[in-house]
Amino acid sequence: MENIITATIFGSVILLAVAALATAIGFSLLGGKFLESSARQPELAASLQTKMFIVAGLLDAISMIAVGIALLFIFANPFIGLLN
């Protein structure tokens, strides 16, 4: 039983680390492309900023979903029920 709990915690930690890394890479690419495109065409900066915030919200949702899945696996572990 301890092996299942340990493996679940390690899996949850890896899930959270990958989600945080993917979100950080996504935000850096999004910010860089926004600055590049608004420097190229300053008259479209307001429209681009709105679209950037929408995509930033979707990027942030990825890590929130990963946190929810990790909390499910840590506190309501469905694999322990398979032991009996």
UniProtKB/Swiss-Prot annotation:
GO terms for molecular function: lipid binding; proton-transporting ATP synthase activity, rotational mechanism. The record marks D60 as: Reversibly protonated during proton transport. Signal peptide: none annotated. Keywords: ATP synthesis, Cell inner membrane, Cell membrane, CF(0), Hydrogen ion transport, Ion transport, Lipid-binding, Membrane, Transmembrane, Transmembrane helix, Transport. GO terms for cellular component: plasma membrane; proton-transporting ATP synthase complex; proton-transporting two-sector ATPase complex, proton-transporting domain. It is a multi-pass membrane protein. PROSITE patterns: ATPASE_C. F(1)F(0) ATP synthase produces ATP from ADP in the presence of a proton or sodium gradient. F-type ATPases consist of two structural domains, F(1) containing the extramembraneous catalytic core and F(0) containing the membrane proton channel, linked together by a central stalk and a peripheral stalk. During catalysis, ATP synthesis in the catalytic domain of F(1) is coupled via a rotary mechanism of the central stalk subunits to proton translocation. NCBIfam families: ATP_synt_c, PRK06876.1. Belongs to the ATPase C chain family. This is ATP synthase subunit c.
